[in-house]
Amino acid sequence: MVDALRVIRDDGSTDPRLDPKFSEDQAVAMYRGMSLQRILDNRMLALQRQGRIGFYGPSLGQEAAIVGAAMAMAPEDWIVPQYREPGAALVRGMPLKELLCQLMGNAEDPVKGHQMPCHYVYRKGNYLSISSPVGTQLPHAVGIGWAMKLRGEKKAVLVFFGDGATSTGDFHAAMNFAGVFKTPTVFLCNNNQWAISVPVSKQTASGTLAEKANAYGFDGIRVDGMDALAVYRATRDAARNAREGLGPTLVEAVTYRMGPHSSSDDPSRYRDEAEVAMWQARDPLPRFRKYLEHAGWWDEGREARLEQEIGDEITRAVQEAERIPPPAIETIFADVYAEMPPHLRQEMDAFLGLPRR
C-alpha cells in the first residue's frame, strides 16, 4: 500500500517507532471488539435471510478501522457514525440486547421503531444516531465540535463516513467549517473502495482522499485500514491535537468492503472476484491475531474459547430480543414534539379509533 501509515508487519511484529505499546489486556480487548463485529455481522446476515430482521449492513473487512478508531477516543468524546459501526458502540459498552432490539424494532428499541435497522444510538456512550442519506452526519459532527469549543470543553468528536460521502456537498460544508473554525473534529473516512456499486476511482480525481484536507487548511493522513494499530495511532494523535485546540484532521483508512453493501446487495454483479481475493489476503482479523501470537498473548485454544463466548452472547441476546413484543401502536406519534400539540393528539385519537384486524 502506497504512502499509508502501517504498524503491524507481515510477520506480526510492529514498527517500534509507531507501536502504541499496548498491554496484553488492551490488545486482547481490541481483538475481541473486532471479532465481535465480525461474528455479529455473519449472524445478522443469516437472521435477515431467515426473515427475523428486515435489513442489515455488514462491516466485513472494516473491523480494524472501526474498532481501532473507536478505542482511540476518550470516554467523554463523541462518536458520530454511519451505518457500519456497531462495533464502535459495542466497545463503548452498548449491550448486545439493546443493539438487537434496535435491529428488530421492538418495544425496548431505544428509538421505538422510528429508525431503520442498523441506525443505532447509544446515549450513555455519546454515540449519536444517524440519518440514512450519505454524508449528512458530517455537518452534525462539526456542529457538536463547534459547541464543545464554544463551551471550552477539552473533548473531541470522531465522525465515520465512506469514500462515497466525499462526493457530497455536506462533506465540503463540514470540512470547510471545521477548517475555518478549527473545530475538534476527527474525520475518519473508511475508504472501502466501493460506494454500493461505484468504485472509488469514479469518486475523485485526487491521488488520495486524505490530501483533500489540504484544501481546507488542515492535515490529512492515510493509514492502512486493515491494521488496527495504525488506525488507533492516527486517530489517537488526531484526537489529542483536536483537544489541544489544533483543529481537525482527516484520517483516510484504506480498507475494503469484503461483503455486500447491505443485505439487499449482490456485489458479484459489479466487482471482480480476483479483487476480493486480493483484499481477503489482507483480512484485518488474522493480521491482528498474528500480532497477538508474536507477542505471546494468543493461541488456538484462546481463539476457540473467544469464538464460543461471543457466539453464546449473541445467541442469548437474540433470544431475549425476540421475546419482546413490538412497540405499542401509539408510539408512532411519540417523540415528535416535547409536548404533543392539539392537532397531533387529534390525529392520534382518530387513528387509535380505527378498527383493528
Where are these regions (language model features)?
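Glycine-rich ThDP/TPP pyrophosphate-binding loop and its adjacent helix/strand module
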Residues: 126-323
